[in-house]
Amino acid sequence: MISYIGGKARIGKWIVPYIPNDIETYVEGFSGMFWVYFNMELNDYPNLKTVVYNDFNKLNTNLFKWAKQYDTFWDALSQYPCQQLGVKETPPEYAQMFNEYQKEIFSDNFVITEENSLEVACKYVYVLGQVFSGSKPETASYMDYKGEYRCKVLVFMDKLKNPKYREHFDKITFIENLDFEKVVEKYDSPTTYFYMDPPYWKTENYYSNHDFDSNDHERLANVIKSIQGKFSLSYYDFPQLQQWFPQYEVTIGKNNQLDMFGYSGYTWEKKDFSKAASTKKEKNVGTELLIMNY
């Protein structure tokens, strides 16, 4: 949809082939910009009846509320001027608008209401569309593209008109603003698939309006290990993961000899990738983990 910290825009195509084709309910516990879902070919999931967007950040859930009303959203966004490809001189009022919107929607006492909901969605897109990819939007600075790039707000608006994206918007059944544990309780079933993409270990404070701290990683592990359905979990590796989701069980036989390796039920897949959001080459490579209970 649009650049967002922790988003799976670059890695979503790798994740999708691991999603079972026979699922009836698709749920993301930390949906963000829903990149994995948008990379799915819906025709490949003939039994899919229910799609659940869930995020604890109310700005995200409000954005998706209006993305489902794509014509209205597009019309509203078209009233917000932004940088143009090939136009090197950026009017100073664009940065002023950005700073005003950023200060307003990220203030501690800000409330989204029925009356301001559409306006807030537009202002949020305006801010997300003019910061460095993956930056924390409430503290990031305005980026002047100097005519070298097309504004990401306009790219987002293109998606609102795109038939493929519209098909995906129309398929979204419920938009939730719940803690991950509550959304699991509400939608778990033998035919449910959960994709979990939590704030990564030691990066919890990078996220806007988050309610996920270091102790919540173990809570998440305990919750998803007990579900009826299937899950995929994205992370970078950290020491506790092998304890919570062991790949192998080791049995020691007589004379302290290694007796066997037994498969535990958790599948680990890994992929190296480049992080688009990094400005330092030495920090621009990561290894993405996908842990599954199938």
How should each PLM-predicted stretch be described?
Residues M33-V36, N57-L59, Q130-S133, F180-V183, ...:
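Short, solvent-exposed loop/turn segments at secondary-structure junctions
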Residues D22-K103:
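SAM cofactor-binding core of SAM-dependent methyltransferases
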Residues D22-Y26, L48-T50, F169-T173, K225-F231:
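Short active-site oxyanion
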Residues M1-V36, N43, K281:
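S-adenosyl-L-methionine
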